[in-house]
Amino acid sequence: MTDVQAALELIKRGAEELLVEAELVEKLESDRPLRVKAGFDPTAPDLHLGHTVLLNKLRHFQELGHQVMFLVGDFTAMIGDPSGKNATRPPLSREQILENARTYQEQVFKILDPDKTEICFNSSWMESLGTAGMIRLASRYTVARMLERDDFAKRYAGGQAIAIHEFLYPLCQGYDSVAMRADVELGGTDQKFNLLVGRELQKHDRQAPQCVLMMPLLEGLDGVNKMSKSLGNYIGITEAPREIFGKIMSISDSLMWRYFDLLSFHPAVEIARYRAEVEGGRNPRELKVLLAQEIVARFHSHAAAEDALADFEARFQRGVLPDDIPEVNVVVGDGGLPVFQVVKQAGLTGSTSEALRMIEQGAVRLNGERVEDKGLVLQRDQTVVLQVGKRKFASVVLN
């Protein structure tokens, strides 16, 4: 395998789509550091693991010797990215944006090498563009082209409002690539239209068009929806080590492999070996421990990871749980099953009303943590430990 082939294999690991691969190969063969861009609008103060999918890929480019440009979209955050949205997003204040941007810079260097990272703010060129420049930029795209975007098309067809400033967002993101002379831009699959606008604007400016690497959107703890703070299915990178560790241990066995592919720095061949070992009978919980330790160590320290493991074992394995916990199978189906129904079907209560009452009294624990939300839905393909009161336990296989 040549150096370029090996580099391409690492770059494509976990990626959903690469446009255009032949162009990227040509850039890699030029034997110069590529300018690799990824933009983050500081719309919330903290990053979660879903954001780190792009950061991890940026780290891969750094390991290959390329220059990473971490773009803080302080200007575009005032517009609000309409990608995947069915309504106009409320704008943030300048003060909110700047404070969020400050915390982003503190957090990204838990993954990125600061010596190989260029922090950029798109206000530095967008604000100097001026009204005349913005009009010239807007003239390069038509309303018809904008309505090719799926989210805009759906809103237009449904009679929902689309504000004029929302059309400016993909143009501004695309212009960032012109200003930064990007060779490669990374983004989520929901960003495809915006990323391709960057290629078009670069061509218009007589630049070589950037290659576009799209990464999948990371599923949250429920294994169904995109990781999101609004859905409560996220793992924040500033959370306590114990919280991060426990949340990773709670994911389904099938979701574990997705997290390994997108969040772990373990080599692909090693992950393939883990899969084979699980198929051969190894307990997947052992591998979740490896993953949880790796993630905690990345955002805290190796010592914190060891402490989190010790805490987890103390709560779930060493003397806290009886040795003879019965194992029961509960069919939950594709849509999951509310926790109170799982409690009842596991035989831990005589009725669903009793299960609900026990949850309200704080007497139900899931993997050692008190269940606060009686509407919590458990997904299939995982094994959980349920406890009701002090003496009732069950290891529940959800399928």
From Swiss-Prot:
UniProt domain S4 RNA-binding: residue ranges: 337-398
Looking at the record's lineage, which domain of life comes first?
Bacteria
Q: Motif 'KMSKS' region — list its residue ranges.
A: 226-230
Cell compartment(s), UniProt: Cytoplasm
Q: What class of enzyme is it?
A: ligase
Question: Is Ligase among this UniProt entry's keywords?
Answer: yes
- Which PROSITE patterns does the entry link to? AA_TRNA_LIGASE_I, S4
Query: What EC number(s) has UniProt assigned to this enzyme?
Result: 6.1.1.1
Question: What family is it from?
Answer: Belongs to the class-I aminoacyl-tRNA synthetase family. TyrS type 2 subfamily.
Q: What is this protein called?
A: Tyrosine--tRNA ligase
Give the originating organism: Aromatoleum aromaticum (strain DSM 19018 / LMG 30748 / EbN1) (Azoarcus sp. (strain EbN1))
Q: Which gene encodes it?
A: tyrS
